Each structure stands twice: as C-alpha cells, then as structure tokens.
Curated annotation (Swiss-Prot):
<dbReference type="GO" id="GO:0051262">
    <property type="term" value="P:protein tetramerization"/>
</dbReference>
<feature type="modified residue" description="Phosphothreonine; by autocatalysis">
    <location>
        <position position="180"/>
    </location>
</feature>
<comment type="subunit">
    <text>Homodimer; mediated via the coiled-coil region. Interacts with NORE1, which inhibits autoactivation. Interacts with and stabilizes SAV1. Interacts with RAF1, which prevents dimerization and phosphorylation. Interacts with RASSF1. Interacts (via SARAH domain) with isoform 1 of NEK2. Interacts with ESR1 only in the presence of SAV1. Interacts with PKB/AKT1. Forms a tripartite complex with MOBKL1B and STK38. Interacts with RASSF2 (via SARAH domain). Interacts with DLG5 (via PDZ domain 3). Interacts with LATS1; this interaction is inhibited in the presence of DLG5.</text>
</comment>
<dbReference type="GO" id="GO:0007417">
    <property type="term" value="P:central nervous system development"/>
</dbReference>
<feature type="modified residue" description="N-acetylmethionine">
    <location>
        <position position="1"/>
    </location>
</feature>
<feature type="modified residue" description="Phosphothreonine">
    <location>
        <position position="384"/>
    </location>
</feature>
<keyword id="KW-0175">Coiled coil</keyword>
<feature type="coiled-coil region">
    <location>
        <begin position="287"/>
        <end position="328"/>
    </location>
</feature>
<keyword id="KW-0067">ATP-binding</keyword>
<dbReference type="GO" id="GO:0051897">
    <property type="term" value="P:positive regulation of phosphatidylinositol 3-kinase/protein kinase B signal transduction"/>
</dbReference>
<feature type="active site" description="Proton acceptor">
    <location>
        <position position="146"/>
    </location>
</feature>
<dbReference type="GO" id="GO:0106310">
    <property type="term" value="F:protein serine kinase activity"/>
</dbReference>
<dbReference type="GO" id="GO:0006915">
    <property type="term" value="P:apoptotic process"/>
</dbReference>
<dbReference type="GO" id="GO:0008283">
    <property type="term" value="P:cell population proliferation"/>
</dbReference>
<feature type="domain" description="SARAH">
    <location>
        <begin position="443"/>
        <end position="490"/>
    </location>
</feature>
<dbReference type="GO" id="GO:0050673">
    <property type="term" value="P:epithelial cell proliferation"/>
</dbReference>
<keyword id="KW-0723">Serine/threonine-protein kinase</keyword>
Amino acid sequence: MEQPPASKSKLKKLSEDSLTKQPEEVFDVLEKLGEGSYGSVFKAIHKESGQVVAIKQVPVESDLQEIIKEISIMQQCDSPYVVKYYGSYFKNTDLWIVMEYCGAGSVSDIIRLRNKTLTEDEIATILKSTLKGLEYLHFMRKIHRDIKAGNILLNTEGHAKLADFGVAGQLTDTMAKRNTVIGTPFWMAPEVIQEIGYNCVADIWSLGITSIEMAEGKPPYADIHPMRAIFMIPTNPPPTFRKPELWSDDFTDFVKKCLVKSPEQRATATQLLQHPFIKNAKPVSILRDLIAEAMEIKAKRHEEQQRELEEEEENSDEDELDSHTMVKTSSESVGTMRATSTMSEGAQTMIEHNSTMLESDLGTMVINSEEEEEEEEEEEEDGTMKRNATSPQVQRPSFMDYFDKQDFKNKSHENCDQSMREPGPMSNSVFPDNWRVPQDGDFDFLKNLSLEELQMRLKALDPMMEREIEELHQRYSAKRQPILDAMDAKKRRQQNF
C-alpha cells in the first residue's frame, strides 16, 4: 500500500495565512475516499507539511455563518482519541472541512471488507480507545450522540479515534439536505427516543449497541423496520447477544453495564475504563493484521473497479458506433438493500450486506450553555465527572423525516381515509390508556392476567403502535412548523435586504 510522505512538520491546525488562500493552493487532492449522506470525502496532502489529511466537501445552500460557527467548536477538542479538525474553507457552493486522515477507515468498513466480525480481543482494544475518547468529550461537556462502528476510525497503526462528533449532525440540522437515508434509531438510548432529557451516558448505551454490532455484524433490531424499533427500544428489556454462550463473562458483563435502561444507573466512561474486559485489553498491535488485510482487499477492489470502468468505456464506445443505443448500466443500483448479514459461528464470517440501511444521520454534538457549564464545574471533584440534570433537547430526530413523507401521502388521500387517520371509539376501546406500557418497565403485573387477557393485549400492540406513531408525528409537526415559519421569515428578510 502507498505510504504517506514523511512529514516535514506535524500539522496541528491551519494557519491564518493558509485559511485566506484558495484550498487548492494549500492542498493537493489525491483521490476520492467515499460518499457520505452529507457530501464527498477526499484524501489530500497539505503542501507545507506533507501531511495526509481528509477533506469533506459539503454543499452549502444557506446559513453558512451558523454552520462555520458550529464547526469551529471542534477546534476546542485536542485528544489522540478524537479525529482532529484543522480548519474549513468556503469555495463556490461547497464547504471544505479539513480533518485528520485515518488510513484504515471505519470499524464498519473493516468488518464489511473482510466479511468477518471481530474477535473479543479486537473489540476490547477498540473499545478501550473509544472509551478514552468518550471520557475526554464528556469532560468537555460534549455529547457525541452518534456512536457506532461507522464513526470509530482506525489509523494504520491500529489507534481508534472518534469521528463525526457534531459535524455531520450539525450540518444535517442546519442545511435541510435532500436525498438522505432515513436516520435509524438502532444505536439510540431509550431516553433519547422518549424525549425525557439525557446527558453524556446516552453515548454509553450507544457504545453497548456498538459492542454487539462489532461482535455480530449488525446492531439489535437491525432486521425490523426502524419505525418499529423506536417503540421496542424504550419498552423492551435491554438487548443482548443472540448467542450469549459464544462470548466471555467479562464481555457479556461489560455490555450489560452499558445497556442499563435507567441513565442514572448506567456506568460512565471513566467507570467502564476500570472494567476487567477493558483493563485486560491487548495493545493496538493486535489490530495491524486485520487492518492490513482490509486495506489489501480494498486495494484489489479498487483495481477491479478501474478495470471494469475501462472495459465499460470500451464497450460503450463500440455500442454507440454500432447502434447508437444507450448502454445498460450495472443492475445493482445505489442504495439497493441486499440481504442482511448472517454469520457462521465457527469462522465468524458474514455475508456482506449493504450498510447504507444502517447509516444514521442522527449525530449532533450538544454543547451545554455557559450557565450549565458553571453548574457542572461545581459538581466536579478530583477530575471525576458527575452527572447533571439536563433539560429535554430541542432537536428533531432524522427518522421523523419518514413521518413527513407519510403525511404528504396521507394528505393526497385525505377525503377517502379520514376515518383511518383519526382513531374512532372502536380503536380506542381496543387499547384503553391503562394498557399503555409502564414507563418503569415493570411487567410483573402480567403474571396475574388470564391467558385471554394476555392474548388481547398482544393483539392490540400493532394498532397501539400505529396510534402512538400518529401522536408522535403530530407532536413533532407542532414543534417543527414554528421553526419553518421563522426560517422562511429570515430568508425573506435576507432577500429584501
């Protein structure tokens, strides 16, 4: 594999002089690394230092100053366990975000390339670095909100670093992007879904889900519809491994401590760093073989794609000369969902699936206000993080975009399905309010019900879910409309100016 050039001097951040130049004067863009829901990512070299960097090119349509202001917050972070942010440029209609380059890619990329899930030793080593990154962010009073294998990057030495803590989410919230994948809730903590207020330990729940994802190839509930998952996560018991007997007691206990439904009882990053599963983690050198294997596979695939492109171009030229007809493209379209992953227990190999289905646009870094920071400072002693009560976050999960599409369809048939959209007395009688799932998760009362009553409750779950989805949709619509009105008013003032 191509080795990055030797650094003339290590890049810490872009100088003021560099930021006043055009980005092409400061960087040599080498190749495209990938396509995200919010833009393209390129590999580039910083000319002055010779250091390899990653550049995200994000289309910007409005509120540029607000985006730049939010991105600048990332400059506060300086940790070897967090992907560094060097600066940003505005060129034409794109925002160029310059960040640290991690040559091995994300953990989910490595799993997908190798068609194998990770071993316990590999998972423990990755989790140790990830927890150190979370401990740093949480001490800085920042919540990642999008912890998953796709946002844990590895460099070629095997060091894991947290990525996209705030950038992707903040841009998503501000830009009103189009053609994005519906955000999935599989990694989200119950308190985030329930909108009851949350703090840093919401990331710990996501880390527990990520642990299962690395071990099994996908998070719990990945095989069901995301809209159903948002009701199962808060109401069901915490998820665990599909086959617990395959995993050690230490690993099982670590995941159990992450996936405690009550945030007050959930462990912090600092506490989990003392867990035996993490304390016994092996050095990062154990990751080098799987990184080398993944990078070799990636290089071979790149060569194959180049050959296929050359052959397609040759065939295209011949077809155009012969018949002037359109050349048929590959039958596999972008975004097509493949079969979900399966794993053979012996070799831990897994059939590759399209991870796009599991991609999430939910990552938004939450910055506490100055008043909250002052309160938190009073609660800190001897460098140990103390929990603080947080008010409900005024944010709209991306999976609610699904409701907007459904609402549009419903309005076009409003005259013929009004009775279905408005639950009548009969639907209310099927699941009275006292049948709602208890918030404390205590289901012991079910033992006292008759078989007939239990069957009726089970039958009522689906219509109950539909009604709760409709109520949730109406609640978010009521919150969303004033924001849209304010944005429209702001745009009109700018146009008049």
